[in-house]
Amino acid sequence: MTNTYTAYSVLRDVTLRDGLQLTGKLLSTERKVEIARQLLALGVPELEIGSMARGDLVPPMANTLEVITALTPDELDRCWVWVATPRHIEKAAAAGAKKFQYCLSASGKHNQANIGRTTEASLAAFPDAVRNTERVGGTIELCIATAFTCPFDGEVPVERVISIANDPRTDGAADLVLCDTLGQAVPRQVTRLFDAAQRRTPQRRMVFHGHDTWGLGVANTLAAIDAGAAMVDGSLGGLGGCPFAPGASGNTSTEDLLFATQPSWFTPNVLESMVGLTDKMLAELGEPNRSKSAQGARSEAHVFPWVIRGGTQ
């Protein structure tokens, strides 16, 4: 198997934010911290641990500040928090966070549904978000949701995404995150957008956030890596989706991405531990496991080293 995963392309597990937010169920602070620490101990390079969205609107995120407070500074160096306003950064930073994913949508209608303001208003606030980040010595990403399609307006033009990434008000963003929020993109579209962004926008670390709605989450992620993505997002068991994007389903499975790319730290023993962690969490949430790799790991093809020894489920 050719390993396309390089030292410059790492996985970020987004289970504790994008994975949980659509479930409607709030895991305890202690349980979230336990999951975060288990993932970090397994070798997952980076995590997304929560959102500063209002708890009454997105109940699974109601204890994000408590999760941040419970983690150590060293752990938080590998953990991102979703934010949509400068005030979100102030509050998360006061709890100890240093990495902020500032999200807005290429689609104005989705931005209004997801964040409650226009895309222009989100862009206008970005310089203040950068200043708040710099005050704590942190890092901020510019995350563009609905970079391919919108649940309300359909296909999003490449030029729309490029114009946002090129807006001088986004100066200070270390990363550019391009999101297939609905999971409707195909690999050639991912390649085209990443190529355009790298050629025509400021030099930033490129990140891909995909969903597996149409079964192309892994293929799209591999296309993004080949086109220069330095970090890619996944969620345990393919859990998740945007509550404000009708038609969106789960994220691309962390297990599937890791099996496809096989970074040096990802071994059959790590996969077995990850499958166990996922199964326990999904049972608590009453959610199915959508990971094909988890299914394969439980198969009876025991001569294959990635199959879990000791039985199937």
What is each residue range found by the language model?
Residues 1-313:
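Catalytic cores and adjacent flexible loops of soluble metabolic enzymes
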